[in-house]
A protein has these predicted regions:
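Short beta-strand segments
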Residues: 27-28, 61-63, 162-169
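Hydrophobic h-region of N-terminal signal peptides that target proteins for export
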Residues: 8-16
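Sec-dependent signal peptide recognition
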Residues: 1-8
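Active-site nucleophile/metal-coordination loop of metallo-enzymes that catalyze phosphate/sulfate
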Residues: 54-57, 61-90
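Active-site-proximal cap/lid insertion segments
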Residues: 18, 30-35, 39-41, 155-159, ...
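Active-site-proximal N-terminal segment of extracellular/periplasmic enzymes that hydrolyze or transfer
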Residues: 18-57, 66, 176
Length: 253
């Protein structure tokens, strides 16, 4: 499953700009809602996300529209349910009819400078420069994204701006499950005694559809965790939380 955690900042240094404030839109990839210390989770520490939550509004009844990256992002930037506009799987191209209606285009037409850095995945990993209303200010990479955004913020802007910072992590937990190297540096292997326990609903659901079990058995790339032991899952959870902390540090920059 994939979730997107989103954080939006409205900032203005001049009273006259209140009607059209500068907007910084930060989102992370595959971060479940409980993976923040401000959500009461004792297994990780996210001071920067906590600070954003404390300074704004923390929604506890919001849902991701799709479990896959591309469809979820498609909904976010078009306002449509993914299956309503043909964005049901990763790799689905954005329909030409929607390109003039995307969030970036609409905000640009409202008089904003719009910039995008990081992961796009609709379907290209990076947003095409000057398309969808955005100037592409940084590639699909967490390394250097914060610095690129800081440089953008330091510029003298003649218009209000809308800046999107799209982080990949904690998506790298997929690489961990597949025993692959992480793109932005590996996480040290923990002692099992330092790993969090398992949730109360850890046991396999006896009512799962047969197709789910079939996918687990026959599609390793989708379900590389099929053979995980309880100890493997505890180490997985430990690593996942360290990846969340890693992206929290990037946001703090």
């Amino acid at each position: 499953m994939k979730y997107l955690a989103c954080f939006s900042l409205l900032c203005s240094s001049m009273a006259s700009a209140i009607e059209r404030p500068n907007i910084i839109y930060i989102f992370t990839d595959q971060q479940t809602a409980s993976a923040m210390s401000c959500a009461g989770n004792p297994d990780l520490h996210t001071p920067n996300l906590d600070r954003l939550a404390a300074a704004g509004i923390l929604f506890n009844n919001a849902y991701c529209t799709a479990p896959l990256s591309g469809p979820s992002r498609g909904a976010m930037f078009t306002g449509y349910y993914p299956d309503a506009v043909g964005l049901s799987v990763n790799g689905s191209p954005m329909p030409d009819s929607l390109k003039a209606q995307t969030l970036g285009t609409l905000i640009k037409n409202a008089g904003y400078d719009c910039a995008y850095g990081g992961k796009w995945h609709l379907p290209l990993l990076e947003v095409p420069d000057k398309e969808y209303g955005f100037d592409n200010i940084y590639k699909h990479s967490d390394d250097g994204l914060a610095e690129a955004c800081a440089e953008y913020l330091s510029r003298k802007h003649k218009k209000p701006f809308f800046l999107v910072a799209s982080y990949d992590n904690p998506h790298n937990i997929c690489e961990y499950a597949r025993r692959q190297n992480f793109p932005y540096g590996n996480i040290d292997i923990p002692d099992i005694r330092d790993c969090p326990g398992l949730p109360a609903n850890f046991a396999k659901n006896p009512y799962d559809a047969d197709v789910i079990e079939s996918e687990r058995i026959n599609n390793y790339n989708v379900y590389p965790t099929a053979g995980f032991t309880p100890e493997d899952w505890r180490m997985y959870r430990y690593t996942y939380y360290r990846l969340v902390e890693k992206v929290d540090r990037e946001i703090g920059k």
